[in-house]
């Protein structure tokens, strides 16, 4: 139960403020009221459910901060950079500018990975381009596997490490800065599964304004979006391993030219979303 006092003195009624702020986000997002509720609850330090308490008020200082953040969101700045966190697989992940925000559809990649881990008794997993650590930390959290994660961004490595500590898996989630699996060359032979949500957006693609605030190296995969896959499969011998990666829905035919013996899987929306290569001997 929230212990904040009801409206009095110079405090403003919270729902008057929420209505005004929601109007500022119309045309920016389809979930303007929800986003304002999340921003307000963040500033006040209470659950958004407690905002429904009758006559709850905000101080002038709190109102000023809320308005600043709403204006920032209205400019296109990503909501989850403002909130400083994003839920993924039922877990709260720290995110900040310079780190890719995990997407809901990537939860399906993690669920597929967990099924394969259970089926084959996999003990060692790699996560390339870990970002916030959403994939790798979730795998470590919901299985007994050890995860070796990499990212080219120092900021991402820092945040991923914090998220591993936050969710109690820092003893099984190890992250280093570098491209592909180069930082863990000495572990490559022992890695049984390789996961990634790589940059696969075409360089010419037109993206929503808020997405453009995210690190371009986590989004764009060259002219046709396939640079990552070409380099990865050209560089590494995946014999004896399982590779599971996210892909663009229109990239299946071109990916077939890059790697053979691959299964392409659809997501819950019926779109091709995952590349699965199983080269285990059993």
Curated annotation (Swiss-Prot):
Any one GO MF annotation of this record: protein-glutamine N-methyltransferase activity
SUPFAM superfamilies: S-adenosyl-L-methionine-dependent methyltransferases
Pfam families registered for this protein in UniProt: MTS, PrmC_N
EC number(s) reported in the record: 2.1.1.297
Catalytic activity line of the entry: L-glutaminyl-[peptide chain release factor] + S-adenosyl-L-methionine = N(5)-methyl-L-glutaminyl-[peptide chain release factor] + S-adenosyl-L-homocysteine + H(+)
Superkingdom in the source lineage: Bacteria
InterPro entries from the UniProt entry: DNA_methylase_N6_adenine_CS (IPR002052), HemK-like (IPR004556), N5-glutamine_MTase (IPR050320), PrmC_N (IPR040758), RF_methyltr_PrmC (IPR019874), SAM-dependent_MTases_sf (IPR029063), Small_mtfrase_dom (IPR007848)
CDD domains per record: AdoMet_MTases
Keyword match Membrane: no
Keywords for this protein: Methyltransferase, S-adenosyl-L-methionine, Transferase
BP-aspect Gene Ontology terms: methylation; translational termination
Top EC class for this record: transferase
Binding site for S-adenosyl-L-methionine: 129-133, 151, 180, 197
Binding site for substrate: 197-200
Keyword Transferase part of the UniProt annotation: yes
Function as written in the Swiss-Prot or TrEMBL entry: Methylates the class 1 translation termination release factors RF1/PrfA and RF2/PrfB on the glutamine residue of the universally conserved GGQ motif.
UniProt subunit comment: Monomer and homodimer.
Miscellaneous field: The crystal structure corresponding to PDB 1SG9 shows a glutamate anhydride cross-link formed between the Glu-97 side chains from two molecules, but this has not been observed in other PrmC structures from T.maritima. This cross-link is suggested being an artifact of concentration during crystallization.
PANTHER family: HEMK METHYLTRANSFERASE, MTRF1L RELEASE FACTOR GLUTAMINE METHYLTRANSFERASE
Family: Belongs to the protein N5-glutamine methyltransferase family. PrmC subfamily.
Name this protein carries in UniProt: Release factor glutamine methyltransferase
Native species: Thermotoga maritima (strain ATCC 43589 / DSM 3109 / JCM 10099 / NBRC 100826 / MSB8)
Gene designation per UniProt: prmC
């Amino acid at each position: 139960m929230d212990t904040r006092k009801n409206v009095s003195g110079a405090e403003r009624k919270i729902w008057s403020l929420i209505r005004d702020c929601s109007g500022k986000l119309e045309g920016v997002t389809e979930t303007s009221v929800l986003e304002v509720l999340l921003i307000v609850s963040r500033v006040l330090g209470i659950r958004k459910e407690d905002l429904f308490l009758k006559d709850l008020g905000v101080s002038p200082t709190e109102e000023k901060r809320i308005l600043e953040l709403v204006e920032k969101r209205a400019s296109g700045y990503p909501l989850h950079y403002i909130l400083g966190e994003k839920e993924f697989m039922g877990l709260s992940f720290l995110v900040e500018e310079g780190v890719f925000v995990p997407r809901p559809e990537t939860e399906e990649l993690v669920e597929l990975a967990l099924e394969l881990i259970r089926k084959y008794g996999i003990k060692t997993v790699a996560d390339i381009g870990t970002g916030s650590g959403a994939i790798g930390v979730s795998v470590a959290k919901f299985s007994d596997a050890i995860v070796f994660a990499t990212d080219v961004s120092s900021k991402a490595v820092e945040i991923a490490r914090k998220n591993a500590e936050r969710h109690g898996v820092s003893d099984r989630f190890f992250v280093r800065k570098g491209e592909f699996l180069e930082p863990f060359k000495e572990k490559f032979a022992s890695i049984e599964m390789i996961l990634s949500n790589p940059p696969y957006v075409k360089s010419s693609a037109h993206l929503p304004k808020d997405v453009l605030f995210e690190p371009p190296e986590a989004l764009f995969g060259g002219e046709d979006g396939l640079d990552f896959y070409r380099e990865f499969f050209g560089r590494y011998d995946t014999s004896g391993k399982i590779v599971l990666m996210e892909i663009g829905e229109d990239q299946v035919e071109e990916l077939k030219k890059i790697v053979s013996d691959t299964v392409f899987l659809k997501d819950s929306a019926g779109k091709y979303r995952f590349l699965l290569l199983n080269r285990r001997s059993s």
